Amino acid sequence: MSKTFVKSKEMGELVNTPSWMDKGLGSQNEVKEEESRPGTYGMLSSLTEEHDSIEEEEEEEEDGEKPKRRGPKKKKMTKARLERFRARRVKANARERTRMHGLNDALDNLRRVMPCYSKTQKLSKIETLRLARNYIWALSEVLETGQTPEGKGFVEMLCKGLSQPTSNLVAGCLQLGPQSVLLEKHEDKSPICDSAISVHNFNYQSPGLPSPPYGHMETHLLHLKPQVFKSLGESSFGSHLPDCSTPPYEGPLTPPLSISGNFSLKQDGSPDLEKSYSFMPHYPSSSLSSGHVHSTPFQAGTPRYDVPIDMSYDSYPHHGIGTQLNTVFTE
């Protein structure tokens, strides 16, 4: 019976778990505390070391020693280094200046050999190079095709890709304006048209009047009505004129002066002048015969009236001149 009692005591101790579990938990807590103690000691030791290092750096700064900087070290700027820098900069500036002077001289020489050299209007660098390229291309085309460098195609090749002022300068220097175009058209006309233009192209220069175009008779004829020219053409060539176009007139902007006072500055003339009369000039026959031989359209037997040249100009004709005109038209 005693043995069973002992067994019951042992079983009771085994069943009683909180006792031995408390012992195990207590041992684990002791181990953790032992492990955590050195960590706290290490943190404190590191803080004390940093504080000591900061104090040492402050002491070094107080002593005058600067801390070392990272990166490339800058050399001290001495007077010798400053002089070397200045001399190097002066040499670079002089080298760039001579280079630009040489480039400008070369461009000036290139402008002189271009077909549109002008002392007043200087082309820019890019325009000079473009014109030189077009000039070389146009000359090569002339050599290949054998055409003359005086046509319109040559100017078009020169002005390709250029600005409007440069194109105007090229056309002006080559003298290819509206007059040259008229000359090219004039070459294609028939000889009958040439003779017609030469007959009616009077060049009467009056002594006492200003320089052309006011002194020419062309300006007075051009302000006449188309019926007068029609009558002149029918009298010289018959009723049928050849198919030829006359060049457009580029006269002055100001109204022409009149010698005899037939053509006033007013646009609205008198009703008597609105009627169609045959044109009969009252200039002396000696002046016309000396200027041109062609005097067939004019009658030689008509009365002539000499008007003094040195009279003062008046926009409204006098009564005496009006009576002379009436007698001319009635006769």
From Swiss-Prot:
Segments of skewed composition (Acidic residues): 52-64
Highest taxon in the source lineage: Eukaryota
Disulfide bonds: none
Coiled-coil region list: none
Region feature (Disordered): 1-80, 246-265
UniProt record, GO biological process: amacrine cell differentiation; axon development; camera-type eye development; cell fate commitment; motor neuron migration; neuroblast proliferation; Notch signaling pathway; oligodendrocyte differentiation
Location within or outside the cell: Nucleus
Record bears the keyword Kinase: no
Keyword rRNA processing tagged: no
Any single Pfam family the record assigns to this protein: Neuro_bHLH
PTM note: Serine or threonine phosphorylation within the basic region may regulate neurogenic activity.
GO cellular component: chromatin; nucleus
Molecular function terms, GO-annotated: DNA-binding transcription factor activity, RNA polymerase II-specific; E-box binding; protein dimerization activity
Keyword list, A-Z: Activator, Developmental protein, Differentiation, DNA-binding, Neurogenesis, Nucleus, Phosphoprotein, Transcription, Transcription regulation
Cross-referenced CDD domains: bHLH_TS_NeuroD4_ATOH3
InterPro entries: bHLH_dom (IPR011598), bHLH_transcription_factors (IPR050359), HLH_DNA-bd_sf (IPR036638), NeuroD_DUF (IPR022575), TF_bHLH_NeuroD (IPR016637)
Known partners and oligomeric status: Efficient DNA binding requires dimerization with another bHLH protein.
Role played: Probably acts as a transcriptional activator. Mediates neuronal differentiation. Required for the regulation of amacrine cell fate specification in the retina.
PANTHER family: BASIC HELIX-LOOP-HELIX PROTEIN NEUROGENIN-RELATED (PTHR19290), NEUROGENIC DIFFERENTIATION FACTOR 4 (PTHR19290:SF86)
The protein's name: Neurogenic differentiation factor 4
Gene this chain is encoded by: NEUROD4
